[in-house]
Amino acid sequence: PLAGFFSKLFVFTACLQSSLYFLTFIGILLSGITAFYYIQIIKIIYFGRLNFWSIYIPIDKSNAVMISITTLLLILFFADNSIFITSNLVSLNIFHFLK
């Protein structure tokens, strides 16, 4: 649970050392907003009561498979290639660093 905290701390520290004060301010502001919403979700889970009943309609297995395949094809063929190129470069840099 503390990995996210320390990673944000290191990013904010690097921004401050690079004199990117506005970016640091925006990051801290957005972290505070997201923390508020996460705390609200936890509060509802542990202390809230449902005011309504939800009805969940199960999806057939064939429909679930079709939705999964369609989503996968859309991501693989219509997503921007820069995402895959960036992840490939990062993995190569990590491999080169460990070698």
From Swiss-Prot:
So where does this one cross the membrane? 22-42, 65-85
Q: List the disulfide bonds.
A: none
The record's subcellular location field reads: Mitochondrion inner membrane
Q: Reaction catalysed?
A: a ubiquinone + NADH + 5 H(+)(in) = a ubiquinol + NAD(+) + 4 H(+)(out)
- Provide this UniProt record's keywords sorted from A to Z: Electron transport, Membrane, Mitochondrion, Mitochondrion inner membrane, NAD, Respiratory chain, Translocase, Transmembrane, Transmembrane helix, Transport, Ubiquinone
Q: What Gene Ontology molecular-function terms does this entry list? A: NADH dehydrogenase (ubiquinone) activity
Topology relative to the lipid bilayer, per the entry, is: Multi-pass membrane protein
Instruction: Identify the EC number(s).
Output: 7.1.1.2
Q: Identify one Gene Ontology CC term for this UniProt entry.
A: mitochondrial inner membrane
| Summary of the function given for this chain in its UniProt record | Core subunit of the mitochondrial membrane respiratory chain NADH dehydrogenase (Complex I) that is believed to belong to the minimal assembly required for catalysis. Complex I functions in the transfer of electrons from NADH to the respiratory chain. The immediate electron acceptor for the enzyme is believed to be ubiquinone.
Q: Of which family is this protein a member?
A: Belongs to the complex I subunit 2 family.
The entry's protein name is NADH-ubiquinone oxidoreductase chain 2
Q: Which source organism does the UniProt entry give?
A: Cyanidium caldarium
